[in-house]
């Protein structure tokens, strides 16, 4: 099973090995998809792998040190507004958006992490974010 989450923590926990402790204490595998760490807070997008029970245990552990929010379907593209210009492609940090061999923009929506870079880049406002 795989689950993606947003994770926020404050300055009290930034210098602690929370992610590695979560892995060691629960057996979950964690992929850090995005991390923004500042002196007063940290924001991460995490992808957790394991059984349902292992992932739930890991989420409970992480929530002791910060706020966890599950990422569901994040982006939606309006095909009537999209002109396949590709502005969104270069802004996607995990290559969820790409151009196929026919020069059409393709979204792998199920892999989106919700960074919202594509939304900001689209000059035609063809991308919506589910909050």
From Swiss-Prot:
Sorted keywords for this record are: 4Fe-4S, Amino-acid biosynthesis, Electron transport, Iron, Iron-sulfur, Metal-binding, Methionine biosynthesis, Repeat, Transport
Which InterPro entries does this one have?
4Fe4S_Fe-S-bd (IPR017896), 4Fe4S_Fe_S_CS (IPR017900), ACT-like_dom_sf (IPR045865), Fe-S_Ferredoxin (IPR050572), NIL_domain (IPR018449)
Binding of [4Fe-4S] cluster 2: at which residues? Answer: 92, 112, 115, 118
Q: Which Pfam families does the record cross-reference, listed alphabetically?
A: Fer4_7, NIL
**Part of which pathway?**
Amino-acid biosynthesis
Cross-referenced Gene3D superfamilies? 3.30.70.20, 3.30.70.260
Q: Which cofactor does it need?
A: [4Fe-4S] cluster
Describe the subunit structure: May form a complex with MJ0100.
Q: What does this protein do?
A: Required for O-acetylhomoserine sulfhydrylase (OAHS)-independent homocysteine (Hcy) biosynthesis. Together with MJ0100, catalyzes the condensation of sulfide with aspartate semialdehyde to generate homocysteine. May be involved in the reduction of the disulfide formed in MJ0100.
Provide the protein name: L-aspartate semialdehyde sulfurtransferase iron-sulfur subunit
Q: Which organism is it from?
A: Methanocaldococcus jannaschii (strain ATCC 43067 / DSM 2661 / JAL-1 / JCM 10045 / NBRC 100440) (Methanococcus jannaschii)
Query: Taxonomy-wise, where does this protein's organism fall, top ranks first?
Result: Archaea, Methanobacteriati, Methanobacteriota, Methanomada group, Methanococci
């Amino acid at each position: 099973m795989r689950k993606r989450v947003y994770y926020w923590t404050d300055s009290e926990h930034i210098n602690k090995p929370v992610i590695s402790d979560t892995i060691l204490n629960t057996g979950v595998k964690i992929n850090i998809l995005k991390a923004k760490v500042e002196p007063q807070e940290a924001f991460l997008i995490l992808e957790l792998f394991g059984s349902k029970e292992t992932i739930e245990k890991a989420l409970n552990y992480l929530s002791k040190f910060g706020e966890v929010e599950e990422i569901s379907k994040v982006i939606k593209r309006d095909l009537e507004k999209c002109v396949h210009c590709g502005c969104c492609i270069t802004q996607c940090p995990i290559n969820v958006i790409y151009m196929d061999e026919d020069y059409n923009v393709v979204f792998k929506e199920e892999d989106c992490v919700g960074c919202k870079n594509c939304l900001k880049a689209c000059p035609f406002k063809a991308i919506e974010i589910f909050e």
